[in-house]
């Protein structure tokens, strides 16, 4: 199994640049590769997405009408034609490599040719505030499970099972860790620093969160306090609840940070409290965009309670209305198709449009 980091980039490496800039906080660059085999339906589909921090900046899809590396951020559009030609060739070579690797892995695991299988990889680097390498990554997964990964020392590998040990021996014989380390310490760092400079208005901005605390009665005896952080960038943020100054980590419900769809992020943390004791609880928030940590309380006078029962009833009404609308539409379509006037109804064509490594949006067109 060949190394999935692009060898051409490694060969272009001539050494790291002198580091003089100081960055606000740490930054990262990640590439995510996914190859999915589809027996009887052509070659495996290969998709690559690249991120700087929390911003996608490049994408490639082998199923596109004209597969090419495509910019996904304004600050990378300024790269010249040679850059995009290199990116495109890199992805096409990787697609071929993954195609071979999928066949090999199927053999390692004694799997038939009938099923579909998935090979994923991620590689990249983190920079500290001084612009120097904090950590490098090179990780692989097969059918959703860890397969093999480059260790933090960038000199050795960890195999997840006996099949991965076959790959590990081949990588060690080829001195692949040295090549990966050269790329991660050199060109990866150099590229990330260039992107941070070109896109500094976007990538190095700090937008503070919009904050509030909501109150949701559960019963006569308990209520949920939810601390909200909205519209912030970058994604890293800390939310904690305290009772009389003591952390309530064990009793806090904390959701993962989520993209808001406009380049910013959202997050909330909730805690269930005894009714009448709400003022003993405080939400504490830290973010790069805040001049100092925030402490928030629920303010009864400024924010009315939001009964959970009311929310459930409201959602139920919306569901009923949606179902009724679908039934009416179906009846109208049936009537038209059986001889009524006004044209015909066709099924909506739906497709998956991957927006990033962790989510897909379903787009339906009538």
Curated annotation (Swiss-Prot):
One of its GO terms (cellular component) is extracellular space. Residues 207-298 are annotated as: Alpha-3. Heterodimer of an alpha chain and a beta chain (beta-2-microglobulin). Residues 1-24 form the signal peptide. Residues 25-308 are extracellular. Glycans are attached at residue 110. Its main location: membrane. Residues 25-114 are annotated as: Alpha-1. This is Class I histocompatibility antigen, Gogo-C*0202 alpha chain. GO terms for molecular function: peptide antigen binding; signaling receptor binding. Keywords: Disulfide bond, Glycoprotein, Immunity, Membrane, MHC I, Signal, Transmembrane, Transmembrane helix. The chain crosses the membrane at residues 309-332. CDD domains: IgC1_MHC_Ia_HLA-B. The keyword Lipid biosynthesis does not apply. Residues 209-297 form the Ig-like C1-type domain. It is found in: Membrane. Involved in the presentation of foreign antigens to the immune system. It comes from Gorilla gorilla gorilla (Western lowland gorilla). InterPro entries: Ig-like_dom, Ig-like_dom_sf, Ig-like_fold, Ig_C1-set, MHC_class-I_related, MHC_I-like_Ag-recog, MHC_I-like_Ag-recog_sf, MHC_I/II-like_Ag-recog. Residues 299-308 are annotated as: Connecting peptide.
